[in-house]
């Protein structure tokens, strides 16, 4: 206790360690008329095998992050593990186990509504009859991703920003040329990153056919080995949505091959692909979600199967025929 400072001391000094800042948060919220409570957060996900031990015999080394929980209009907010670049309601311990100090009861920490870690990407492809394509890329950042990108772009020097933009453009396709500059907007939520490129030979014309690939390869599990002897631990869940809106070329409207709607599932995650087509447009939406899990070696091939299905050629290629 001798290492802890009073709230007034931390406020006057302008700095303090995590516990000092938690004490200050608690004092300020109490003075403002709220009813905060101290919570010790851990890095442990709420899995059955882990939760049982942690609740029965919580170890001090597992609960080392002092946080302050306050409920406003029925919504819980956790403070003290983010910075000035983060969205209020986000927490680095989303989905982790916590310990309420006053009651010594275990709890599960959650970010506020729409403040969990997530990313949404929108690709717009306008394909011409010659194969030249304009590709627009818009990314929306939520939760911890918002805070990280806001911090990154806020501190990025102009020269480094230009280099980042050049590298980002080159990742879209070989020979991509920027149309305008990079737009970033983090003074509102979610954070936005947006740019547009032209690619002369994005699509290939071969007689009466035209073909091209989606500008990305979806991935649910970044698995490496072909087999495992020990279980695979997925400590953190993820949520990503990738939407691709394709404006078809004037003369090539007959779709011969295109990604199909399907749902792929394995222990610890699901991938849902939705494909819709109109007279002049095709829209592909990939919804990818993983959850914390301990994957037994016997279930590991199911993960490989899902990843293989997402990476196969038929999951990203379009073949159009001239009408």
Model-derived regions, located:
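A sensor for short, sequence-defined functional sites
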Residues: 1-323
């Amino acid at each position: 206790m001798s290492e802890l400072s009073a709230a007034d001391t931390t406020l006057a000094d302008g700095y303090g360690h995590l516990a000092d800042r938690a004490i200050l948060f608690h004092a300020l919220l109490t003075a403002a008329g709220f009813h905060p409570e101290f919570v010790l957060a851990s890095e442990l996900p709420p899995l059955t095998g882990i939760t049982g031990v942690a609740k029965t015999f919580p170890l001090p080394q597992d609960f080392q992050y002092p946080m302050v929980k306050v409920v406003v209009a029925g919504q819980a907010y956790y403070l003290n593990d983010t910075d000035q670049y983060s969205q209020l309601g986000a927490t680095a311990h989303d989905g982790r186990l916590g310990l309420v100090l006053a009651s010594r009861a275990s709890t599960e920490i959650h970010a506020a509504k729409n403040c969990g870690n997530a990313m949404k990407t929108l690709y717009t492809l306008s394909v011409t009859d010659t194969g030249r394509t304009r590709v627009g890329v818009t990314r929306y950042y939520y939760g911890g991703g918002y805070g990280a990108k806001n911090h990154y772009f806020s501190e990025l020097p102009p020269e480094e920003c230009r280099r980042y933009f050049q590298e980002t453009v080159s990742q879209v396709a070989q020979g991509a040329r920027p149309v305008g500059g990079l737009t970033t907007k983090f003074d509102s939520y979610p954070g936005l990153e947006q740019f547009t490129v032209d690619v002369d030979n994005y699509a290939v014309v071969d007689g009466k056919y035209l073909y091209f690939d989606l500008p990305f390869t979806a991935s649910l599990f970044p698995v490496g080995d072909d087999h495992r002897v020990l279980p695979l631990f997925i400590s953190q869940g993820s949520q990503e949505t990738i939407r691709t809106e394709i404006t078809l070329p004037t003369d090539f409207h007959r779709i011969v091959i295109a990604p199909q709607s399907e749902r792929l599932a394995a222990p610890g995650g699901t991938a849902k692909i939705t494909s819709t087509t109109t007279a002049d447009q095709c829209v592909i939406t990939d919804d990818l979600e993983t959850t914390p899990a301990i994957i037994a070696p016997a279930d590991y091939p199911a993960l490989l199967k899902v990843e293989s299905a997402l990476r196969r050629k038929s999951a990203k290629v379009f073949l159009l025929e001239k009408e």
